[in-house]
Design a protein with these regions (language model features):
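Ser/Thr-centric signal marking residues that sit
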Residues: 51, 148-149
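Short secondary-structure capping/junction motifs at helix and strand boundaries
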Residues: 114-136
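Conserved small/polar residues in nucleotide/adenosyl-binding loops
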Residues: 142-148
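Basic/hydrophobic alpha-helical interface regions
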Residues: 1-74, 78, 82-119
Length: 150
């Protein structure tokens, strides 16, 4: 009985992640290979979702809740993991302070996502995010350009 429940949860998690991947693909075809490069692995010890660069690990309850409550947030979480891998954040830490590295990489990835003006990933930026991006741009640590319009 318990094995059947775990199998069902795994199928549902895979379906949620595949649906999220497909929605992102519709808007970002240039990320085709990157979006499709992960195996999906159920892992109740994970807090939400995460990746090691090859697999996306997910807590079934957290994944289902995120998908049900806010599809944009789900899309952003998936894209966040993909961008971490594309930018080699998973493999380039070397001797750097782990906490500082992770926060810096998260800010870099979220900045990219926040400045791609696509409905499927759009969330209103908080004042804190705007202030941080402004400070980093003034220090020339990130460059934020306005999107070009046809």
């Amino acid at each position: 009985m318990e094995e059947n429940i775990n199998e069902r949860l795994s199928e549902l998690g895979t379906k949620i992640l595949a649906t999220t991947r497909n929605e992102l693909y519709i808007h970002m075809r240039f990320l085709d290979v990157a979006l499709s490069s992960f195996a999906y692995v159920i892992d109740p010890s994970v807090n939400g979702v995460g990746t090691d660069g090859m697999c996306m690990f997910y807590h079934p309850g957290a994944l289902g809740g995120m998908y049900r409550q806010n599809r944009v947030r789900m899309n952003r979480a998936y894209l966040h993991m993909v961008l971490h891998c594309i930018l080699h954040h998973v493999t380039r830490r070397k001797g750097r302070d782990k906490t500082l590295w992770n926060i810096s990489c998260d800010i870099a990835v979220e900045s990219i996502i926040d400045h791609w003006h696509l409905k499927c990933i759009h969330m209103v930026q908080t004042r804190l995010r705007k202030d941080i991006y402004g400070q980093l741009e003034r220090l020339s640590l990130i460059h934020i350009s306005e999107p070009t319009r046809p």
